[in-house]
Amino acid sequence: MSDEVRLRDVEETDLEVFFEQEQDPEATRRSQFPPRDRERFMTHWTTKVLGDPTVLVQTVTVNGTPAGNVVSWWEEDRRFLGYWFGRPFWGRGIGTRAVTLFLQREQTRPLYADPYTGNTGSVRLLERCGFTRAGTVWYGDNEHILLVLHA
């Protein structure tokens, strides 16, 4: 039996799940995204994600259990896509299915993503969803691949 992957609006209780997922050392190593303390995390989510009407964010559930989130936001004149999944949901095709569902809701094109170069699983996920490599960007000492999804 395959996993049932669905998207739904974020509920307040999901934030605790997302916070715990961000604290996973392997996830932060792969993403090169440092974990935030609880107060900074919750403030970011309540003001910059849930509090911003231009942000589209969905909780990803697997068989009814929150597995992570997919989000899109504006950075200047570019719309970006990002996601975060708990480790138990890695390597099962869940991310690809979730992003595919999300892309049916997020209609802005071009749409950009910039995973850390060393996060090969994330790069492959985006390429499976139709993103193509457009260059590299640097955040401090970390090289990221800029990918774009065209119309």
Locate the predicted segments by residue.
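Acyl-donor (CoA/ACP) binding surface of acyl/acetyltransferases
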Residues: M1-E26, R30, V57-A151
